[in-house]
Amino acid sequence: MARRRRPEKREILPDPKFGDVVLSKFMNSVMLDGKKSVAEGIVYGALETIETRAKREPLGVFHEALNNVKPGIEVRSRRVGGATYQVPVEVRPDRSQALAIRWLISAARARSEHTMAGRLSGELLDAANNRGNAVKKREDTHRMAEANRAFSHYRW
């Protein structure tokens, strides 16, 4: 493993339709087996569905959903003596965004609608309204951190 320096972050180009870098990252996470055009079709289809169903600006709904799912705090395992403690730590903004994207996609994949675009649009609308499994996951994470607040002095 390299020890000298951190690798520089790769620049992610904004998506072609909306010109949004975060949406581009989201598409890359939706993508399976390198099929980017399929992922683009799914995400753009979901955003169109949001526009028709909710009569709201789809990019605004997307960012609202993402912000509602972003965790502010999480627990990490820390071994002290013979015991392992779940220590609450603050989440860096880039990790917070990555977790929110991951949770939104996994919650959408677990839904029962017929198409992935339909599942994704449903989950994004739910998350924008502070409902759905992705928001539940964030609340569970925060609850876990609150329950283990006594171990916060083990932070590193």
From Swiss-Prot:
Name recorded for this polypeptide:
Small ribosomal subunit protein uS7
Q: Name one GO cellular component term.
A: small ribosomal subunit
Record keywords, A-Z: Ribonucleoprotein, Ribosomal protein, RNA-binding, rRNA-binding, tRNA-binding
Q: Describe the family membership recorded for this protein in Swiss-Prot or TrEMBL.
A: Belongs to the universal ribosomal protein uS7 family.
Which HAMAP family would you find in this protein's record? Ribosomal_uS7_B
Per the entry, what this protein does is: One of the primary rRNA binding proteins, it binds directly to 16S rRNA where it nucleates assembly of the head domain of the 30S subunit. Is located at the subunit interface close to the decoding center, probably blocks exit of the E-site tRNA.
**UniProt GO MF annotations:** rRNA binding; structural constituent of ribosome; tRNA binding
Primary gene name: rpsG
